[in-house]
Amino acid sequence: LISGNDLDLPDEDLNSEVFKNQSSIRTLADTTTFTFVNILRGETSFGTLMDSLGYPCVPSTNDPGPAGLRYFSGGYITDRHGSSDGSVISAIQVELPQPGIRDTGENWSRYASAFAKAIDIYYKFHMGKELEL
């Protein structure tokens, strides 16, 4: 999986086969028409989509890397079931802070709607499929 230190690298360094092949979105990167760095933190990245819906994310165009701060790059499930080993399922780890998302039912609901919308747009960009929401 890609570490926070790796995310702090410039696009031209990160946009390589080495980093793509160790990411949990490797298979997606092999099948989409967009560059690896674009789907990781560019205009068509999940983080940028969430950011555009009011939920700042790392990585995204506004926050491409953690800038040396603590960053959790993924756990067992993302590593085991993502596509860094070349398998067909790509995975993205999402960590949610308590304040503003998990603190009330209303915030959960608002976040869930934005999350579903971002997934729908992401699928359209990278898989050419529309979800039934």
Protein language model features and the residues they cover:
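Short Gly/Thr/Asp-enriched flexible loops that form oxyanion-binding sites at enzyme active sites
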Residues: 1
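Acidic, glycine-rich loop-and-strand cores that form catalytic or ligand-binding grooves
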Residues: 4-68
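Hydrophobic/aromatic-lined pockets within catalytic cores
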Residues: 51, 55, 120-127
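Active-site-adjacent mobile loop/cap segments within catalytic or ligand-binding domains
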Residues: 60-125
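Short, highly charged C-terminal tails/helix-capping segments
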Residues: 128-133
